[in-house]
Amino acid sequence: MTTPASVDDVRRRNLATLLRLLHVHGATSRADLTALTGLNRSTVKTLTEDLVVARLARETAPVGRGGTGRPSITVEPESERVFVVALDVGVAHLTALRIGLGGVVLDRRDLEQGTGDYAVRRTLGRVVRLVRALLDGAPPGSRCVGIGVGVCGVVSDDDGVVRFAPNLGWVDVPLRALLADRLDTTLPITLGNDGDLGARAEHLRGVARGLTDVVYIAGEVGIGGGVIAGGRPMRGTGGYAGEIGHMVIDPKGRVCRCGRRGCWETAISEEAVLLATGAPAGTPLADVLTAYSTGEGWPRAGMRRVGRALGTGVANLVNVFNPQLIVFGGTIRHVFAVTEPIVRESLVGVLAASAEQVQLVVAGLGNDSVAVGAAELGFAALLDDPLGTMQGLPLVARTGA
């Protein structure tokens, strides 16, 4: 026999529903919150007052009448007071954002990583410095409710271990525990794969908002991806779905860092572009793409090969997932932008119905897709139990958290 929910359980669930709506939609009238939740007006009024007292939301009195009846009070999330630190740990870069409730980017720190300089201790030191800089810049009296981390590798959700990140050279790195120790914090730290988080961010706040079936492709040194199916992230057994960069498209191709031969990554990554075009090692990708798009001859043949390889992988993804949208993020969006006609030619061989339905677009959040997705990991505990999570969290002081 199922035990009926207690009054406290119902209240906690309703507060979570209300705060999640504010987090996703931003400023919303009480009348609209009533309609969206299906709760009565007095319940919504009480719940919003609870969120205001907890300093999770604020209410704004209506300026004037927009129609008949009494204008409804507007409720919005306290973006400046409640925030997370979101990290994108890439191969060539580190990005740290302070993101307020409601998805507002409040502050950022970016750092380029030197080629091959990915030792765990050194990378961890850089990440810790970025996090502390963001916390030091937070206004006094605000609260950090969590830290979300996107990593370009296979991540175990349960224990926060980076199982395999070939482009960083990491194997079984307990990143969550290491970060908690170095930051000396009890804040929840949650890790996720960069491709999964990029897909989540574009679905929640980017070009895929409102759609149900989306494939996100991103990369720089490596290629990753994430899939939204039926409006939900596709996790797979163990949460390792979406490693599309290691889809084999040429069994006789180059050896990948993962040890296999002919992975998609070996044909379309930044390194692959330089090799295909004959550009000297270390040449900025932007220089190669500019030369190609302006009609210079030297990169033409190589870029066409890259475009065909990109198109082959895209065609495979369309056939397998039948998405409404394929989103190109990271630096691969720039490769797609200059090879789009070649990529689209590859869709000729795709099942007609799938090819007609899919759209190919670049990421709406640009380079921030992964970090914005990581922020959602940081907010997860708060959105599940708003008042319980806020209890005991320290206020940010002038010199840090």
Question: What are the functions of these language-model segments?
Answer:
Residues 24-25, 205, 220:
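Short helix-capping/turn signature of helix-turn-helix
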Residues 76, 87-90, 208-209, 216-219:
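Short loop/turn motifs at secondary-structure junctions and domain boundaries
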Residues 195-196, 223, 328:
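AAA+ ATPase active-site-proximal loops
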Residues 100, 157, 228:
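Short, acidic, Ser/Thr-enriched surface-loop or helix-capping motifs
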Residues 1-112, 116-143, 184, 252, ...:
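ATP-binding/phosphotransfer module of carbohydrate and carboxylate kinases, centering on a glycine-rich
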Residues 105-108, 112-148, 153-215, 337-349:
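Glycine-rich phosphate-binding loop and adjoining helix at the ATP-binding site
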Residues 211-267:
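Glycine-rich phosphate-binding loop of actin/hexokinase-like ATP-binding domains
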